[in-house]
Amino acid sequence: MVSYRATTETISLALEANSSEAITILYQVLEDPSSSPEAIRIKEQAITNLCDRLTEEKRGEDLRKLLTKLRPFFSLIPKAKTAKIVRGIIDAVAKIPGTTDLQITLCKEMVEWTRAEKRTFLRQRVEARLAALLMENKEYVEALALLSTLVKEVRRLDDKLLLVDIDLLESKLHFSLRNLPKAKAALTAARTAANAIYVPPAQQGTIDLQSGILHAEEKDYKTGYSYFFEAFESFNALGDPRAVFSLKYMLLCKIMVSQADDVAGIISSKAGLQYVGPDLDAMKAVADAHSKRSLKLFENALRDYKAQLEDDPIVHRHLSSLYDTLLEQNLCRLIEPFSRVEIAHIAELIGLPLDHVEKKLSQMILDKKFAGTLDQGAGCLIIFEDPKADAIYSATLETIANMGKVVDSLYVRSAKIMS
């Protein structure tokens, strides 16, 4: 069997070989016992090439084993280079679909190793990555516990760049847990830390994106739109895939402030045309349904673009609210001509299941959206006329108020006379 040494010629040979042969050659290069500066440099190249090859073949488990195998090599190179290689391999595993659990395992192993080796700088960054993965995996309690400890440690060391990342993660985590005050507080902390240093455009875009999400959650869609626009510009300039999500949320804000007619114009703009695809098609379908006040079109959009609408938690929160509003408007319009009507007839007119319509009408009555009652025995909705306020009540209140003023005035005058 041919043995390959850590030389430039071997790297060139690996680059020319097919994937399987290249992987074998590169593994042998890493096993070369030589620790000369040249051999170390060649091994670093071999690690990069091997990562690329294993990622292409979607061999995530082999990447995890590679990271374990490289631990003795890490003692020969500077800590900064070790950190770069470790993060590079974790990033390589992340490129392989369906490896979230593997990434979590890998990060936990690396946290243990970095703790044993007292590599604080690398450990903190791997822990931040682990917290993000746990949040993605909906393991919120574990992620929050990890972040709570990490943020205190990083704040003490005053590593502001990492602190921005951690505060942003904490904001996203609290938002996922529906704790808006804490999400806003963490975002404010991230902005404060970011103001003291130079923040890379990608990180600034992430801050703007999170700001837009929180403003939209508070129904401040105009401010949310501004932040989403800033995030879109940052991500678009970098070619970051998050640009399409920023644009999608911009369109969502337009729909929520009843400016659905602007959606088509934004999509057909020079910037929008770059991102034409299912996400923008979904928002266009929702905008069309909203413009036409059509529940049928709205439901068709939710069905046809389930992945883009219902599976996106940000969009889903707002569209469920929009759907309720649209449903209420349609029901009010349909029952307006009647004083008594069968619920089945309303359900037929609106094209929704009977029990769904009955439940919604009951909720609207309780919320005082209209005056009425449900006769469930007869399966009817009885609508009452809006009670007209008797003018005598307002006149009586006005008279009492005037009498109060007179009494107060008399009291003041008598007090002056007595003094």
From Swiss-Prot:
Q: In which tissues is it expressed?
A: Ubiquitous with highest expression in flowers.
GO cellular component terms? nucleus; plasmodesma; proteasome complex
- UniProt xrefs under SUPFAM superfamilies: TPR-like, Winged helix' DNA-binding domain
Domain called PCI: residue spans: 217-388
The source's domain of life comes to Eukaryota
Q: Which family does it belong to?
A: Belongs to the proteasome subunit S9 family.
User: What's this protein's function?
Assistant: Component of the lid subcomplex of the 26S proteasome, a multiprotein complex involved in the ATP-dependent degradation of ubiquitinated proteins. In the complex, RPN6A is required for proteasome assembly.
Supply the PANTHER family for this chain.
Answer: 26S PROTEASOME NON-ATPASE REGULATORY SUBUNIT 11/COP9 SIGNALOSOME COMPLEX SUBUNIT 2
- Stated name of the protein: 26S proteasome non-ATPase regulatory subunit 11 homolog
Q: Quote the gene name from the UniProt entry.
A: RPN6
